[in-house]
Amino acid sequence: MRCNCPYVVCKYHGNCAACIAHNRESGDMAHCMEKVAMERGAKMPLRMPEKVYLENDYEAMSRRSAELVCDVVRKKPDALVSLPAGSTAKRTFEIMCEMAKAGEVDFSKTRFVALDEWLDLEDESENCNGFMCKHFYGPAGIPDEHITRFDIHAKDLDAACKAVDEVVFANGGIDVMLLGVGMNGHLGLNEPNSDFTLYSKVVDLDSVTMSVGQKYFTDGMKLTRGITLGIHHMFETGLVILRVGGVHKAEIMEKVFRSAPTEDIPATVLKLVPHGVIVTDRDAAANVLDLLENI
């Protein structure tokens, strides 16, 4: 049975009695209880992600991210992996390909599932799939049959979402998911105010995403909608890695760290997922170094 909790996905999948019993024993508080308490004025201790890797620069951050993904593949060669399209991930992909060529990791049995994709583009040559084929799938020699993509031309896009979900469910969840964070805190194309309980879905893009997304297209592009793995999948992923780099991400990084988990800032879900880590460089973490000292 899938969780129907109106607050957030949890490992008890709607078995509230078991959740309450666990929290009595541990002295902890479930997120749903925490949310109600905060709405009534209680001051709760600040939640932190499970693990944060603070790296000196972009190169070190990229290498750490690559190592974390490849470590999962070494332990499970046929792992199901989800990777993000985007310029900040290029060096991570280069390192992963270098490691494969050096025999340090083998992707021949690894399977991949698309994180997200733009919809309604006039020219799809520079979409997410095009980026991934150019910068990772092609160089790494990943066969097409090992890649699950959203059918962006389907007449029934909800059915296309369910088809991808079924691939993930059949695997027992994604084994490792690498993410970047948007300037508005989005993960994949899970925009602000995304429902944490949803799996794959079609989304209307936030104005920030419409604007910032222009950088991925040579001649600009009208962006209106997207399709994405939902945040619920992240709760059922073996390892979720959020990489955040550059001084331009310092503001959203501070919001993520200094906010309670909230659907207003999707990236705060990293404070809730069972196996979530953040990999960041000092530029992005400049405003939260005081918090990182205690993790």
Enumerate the predicted regions with their spans.
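N-terminal glycine-/serine-/threonine-rich phosphate-binding loop
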Residues: 40-81
